[in-house]
């Protein structure tokens, strides 16, 4: 019994979660827009900007998305993005949100691929909140990550690529 409890305690310690926070700012550029009907609109746009996180990292990011609006509310938003850290390590993410106001909302992203050093982050899921003012985007992402993922992200600044 003591052995089982010890194993469970150690296992739980290894999966403890850390709140990884990322703040992103970017500029939106609309590529194509169609008024599908009187109340429905399709947009294709890109976002480009910078980011910082609560582990001391920083970098640049970009995203290409498609959006369907009905009465200025988000029906569907999907996109893919790339974040490049200060040491040129990178990750690709996919994101989505739906059924929210166009200028503000909450969604999810997931890491779908990454450079070699960041490959253990594939599958990491985060919640984001976004606000737009004019064509400027303000994002905050929150990810519950394991200590192993935190160690990888903390060591980015120490790695030279």
Question: Which residue stretches match the model-derived regions?
Answer:
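Bacterial N-terminal signal peptides
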Residues: 2-11
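Beta-strand-enriched cores of mature, soluble protein domains
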Residues: 16-161
